[in-house]
Regions:
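Extended substrate-binding grooves/exosites of carbohydrate-active enzymes
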Residues: 1-160, 165-185
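Intrinsically disordered, low-complexity Pro/Gly/Ser/Thr-rich segments with frequent PxxP/GP/PP motifs
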Residues: 175, 179-244
Length: 256
């Protein structure tokens, strides 16, 4: 009755109710199928059998501690399965606040740091941003990479750009290509690539004066031994309300 009340009074909004997965008598309550923390394989199998509704993870990829490592399995599934609508990460910001430890050093504290017993200890530290100034954690870098709408695959002497955006051409960004040797930048180029939305294109890597691992003459005879990394990035051309010019929106890497 409550779901029908919502639909009558605001037909512009979808109705979500996770509980239908536990009692199918109320299946019409929710406009979408929803679960917390099923595996990507479970979602794929479910949608192969039941395609009556889109599937949404109302909570997934719990971002506690050293986590988010398997997130790509879900974002890969969004590319493969049109009925899978993604999910909501738990959660965005660590529930932690600054306080001084026993040595007088200011640190981010959580359960148990304030003589609070019993408590859940670090269970509140489950965000992709730290508490305090909301600085990004390493988990945020993983999330950003998995959510980027432009993917770059680097081969021996070329790279393929897959533009997953629905409306944005990659020409709206600058494409930066850098070569590093053992972490030190030794060559760089900025170019403009126009890959239409929902399409892909392959390009050759630059022919820098510095002999590279993909030089055509002797492909693997390089000037110096070490780890060569080529990075192809797409960055903002101009300042926006949410980020400055040069902010990276997508990247891909190849290691030689």
């Amino acid at each position: 009755e409550m779901s029908e009340f919502y639909r009558r009074n605001d037909p512009t909004r979808l109705v979500h109710y996770e509980g239908v997965c536990n009692d199918r008598r109320y299946n019409d309550t929710s406009d979408m199928e929803s679960r917390m923390y099923p595996s990507a394989a479970y979602v794929r199998d479910f949608l192969q059998k039941d395609r009556s509704k889109p599937y949404l993870l109302c909570e997934y990829t719990h971002a506690m501690g050293n986590s988010c490592g398997g997130m790509h399995k879900y974002t890969d599934l969004t590319d493969e399965e049109p009925l899978f609508q993604g999910g909501f990460i738990w959660d965005y910001i660590d529930q932690s606040i600054y306080h001084k430890d026993r040595y007088g050093k200011e640190v981010l504290g959580y359960g148990g740091d304030f003589d609070d017993r019993p408590c859940d200890y670090n269970f509140s530290g489950n965000g992709i941003a730290y508490g305090g100034e909301r600085m990004p954690s390493p988990k945020m870098q993983e999330v950003k990479f998995n959510y980027q709408n432009i993917s770059i695959t680097i081969e021996k002497d070329s790279f393929t750009v897959n533009n997953k955006n629905l409306f944005t051409n990659t020409a709206d960004y600058d494409c930066q290509i850098t070569l590093t040797l053992d972490g030190k930048r030794i060559a760089a180029s900025t170019i403009e690539l126009a890959v239409e939305p929902l399409s892909q294109q392959t390009y050759q890597l630059p022919r820098w004066k510095y002999q590279t691992p993909w030089s055509t003459e002797e492909p693997w005879k390089v000037t110096a031994a070490g780890e060569y990394v080529v990075t192809v990035s797409f960055v903002l051309k101009e300042d926006t309300l949410w980020a400055k010019r040069g902010h990276e929106v997508a990247f891909g890497q190849g290691i030689y």
